[in-house]
């Protein structure tokens, strides 16, 4: 092949694995230094090819974890559904590094505002909050309960039976993910500017959709939100874009390419792409929470 135009969108999984595991992944986000080295190597290869081909390049940056429904769905439902006046400690969870007694405690406003995020994997357990249960430990085949855990205590509202760390991004973990994304994106922007590439700002685009969730954002007559399934932007795993959202992303590329290189590529009519409303009726709910079988999200990074 001898391409005359190259697009590059890479780096999402360097932070997503850490975030989707609730910060418990054995691999922390790819360090900024290593990311810079790896991304720089890709750009070096591109520059070598550009030198002999004259090809043009567009690169895209990385969206925030706080803009996708894998992280924003369950916490807001917990905020709306718990009898907060009856919970002196609020929502009790394990902070980063904890596997036994949980020292984290969140109020209704903490949950509603996204200061604490509960992953979509935690949805099936959210319906059990307040019950004396050890379902999490049974489902995950713990040989014995961690020290300090007492499953006769009400789940998710007592320090001795806290909501598991694997399903929660606490304030420190959110900061780690956000700071990592910001550093990655700064490096991507720097290399794009230095080498004359078009920069596609997917981060700002997704954040804008998230900020407009109350009324939604209208594209080609269709209203889009970042809400799980019904919003039309994200697929059933809460991470990957729908077909129509890929059209929206393509238009972001087109906009950046036209602006940078003076091209006249016409935008895609997103309404001509089949939507995903069919799937809205295919998600089961319990007490308002989507029930997601564990194995469904095992390969969320692919």
Enumerate the predicted regions with their spans.
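Conserved SGNH/GDSL esterase-like catalytic core that processes O-acyl groups on lipids
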Residues: 1-44, 64-66, 71, 270-300
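A structural motif corresponding to the C-terminal end of an alpha-helix
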Residues: 41-59, 180-200
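Mobile gating loops/cap/lid regions near enzyme active sites that modulate substrate access
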Residues: 72-179, 186-239
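Mature extracellular "passenger" or substrate-interacting domains of secreted, surface-exposed proteins
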Residues: 1, 5-9, 17, 31-41, ...
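Histidine-centered active-site loop/cap adjacent to the catalytic His
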Residues: 224-275
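Surface-exposed patches in mature extracellular/periplasmic domains of secreted proteins
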Residues: 59, 198-204, 261-271
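Structural recognition of the beta-strand scaffold that forms the well-ordered cores
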Residues: 4-9, 16-17, 56-61, 198-201, ...
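Extracytoplasmic/secreted proteins, especially bacterial periplasmic and envelope-associated proteins
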Residues: 14, 34-45, 172, 176-179, ...
